[in-house]
Amino acid sequence: LVKEEDIVVDKDLFLINAETGSLYFAGGGTYAQIPAIDGHEDFIYIAGGGEAIGALSMLGGLYVVNQSTKQWELKYKDTVRAYGYARLARFSTGWVFYKGGGGDGKNYVIIVYDDGTVKERSVVGPVSNISTGPYDYCCVGASYQGGARIYTFLATSVPDSLTYYTPGMFTPSAVIQGFHSSPRSVVYSTTSNYTYVSTNPTGTQWTAATTRPQLTALTKGLYANEAGTNTFMLIGNNMKSVSTDGGNNWTTSTLGEYTLTDLIYVDSNWYAIGSNGTKRLLLQNTASTFDQSNK
């Protein structure tokens, strides 16, 4: 789910991707499937907002909407070897995503800047999550030899090599790049609800959360500075877990009747894709409760 300001017709649009990888535009009375792009209909990951809308084809690479022509353009694909692509995130001047599965045992984080510059950095294992946040900090969660390997760096000035830190021996189900007194990140695992918080902007030190989330599944992790609250949120099934103290203590509660499959926070509003068992619905709610009255 990505929110777009369509400056041509002056209305809000949302880019939505189905579980099959098909793309749709919805909003303002419009609901239309986007035809296959260069033959690809495997866009499992989308990111951005406003005038920067991107979609990542699992086999075809990164596509971005040209705001002048309103057409999708290929921004990155490895031309030497066939890789798979996943975990797309947007920062102020570019995109971050994972490249791997090329049969060479290599795993990479790719940074593509809006000016066309590309940076490729090696990581030790498959990437399960990427998150960008305030001040263009980026947190990457990878797995290697049974443990979480977390990379934190400034996306606008990526170092020549990335250094990981290990909060624990678990798979990082979600990483959330946020802010609490200073940039910090949260790593969460569905294994025993393990949750760790970085105690400095560069993610070199991690401490276990005092009160963990109590979720039975994970859909998404999100940071939103809602009314200055520095809110970290995890959602799964029809439950949410929220921290307002930098990720140290989490309060878990049940959402409304909908199971949320995606969630974003834009311009002081929460938007979600929810399912009631028979239909998928686009929901909006400033209080993040998502009940029947707010569909």
Where are these regions (language model features)?
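Repeated scaffold domains used in trafficking and secretory/extracellular systems
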Residues: K3-D10, A32-I46, R81-S92, V123-Y135, ...
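Entry beta-strands of beta-propeller and related beta-repeat scaffolds
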Residues: D12-L13, D42-A47, A52-G54, T93-Y98, ...
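Residue-level signature of beta-propeller blades and closely related beta-rich strand-turn architectures
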Residues: E19, G29, G50-A52, G101-G103, ...
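Conserved Ser/Thr-centered positions that define the repeating blades of beta-propeller domains
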Residues: F25-A26, V64-N66, V112, F153-T156, ...
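A detector of repeated loop/turn-to-beta-strand junctions in beta-rich toroidal repeat architectures
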Residues: S57-L59, G105-K106, G147, S192, ...
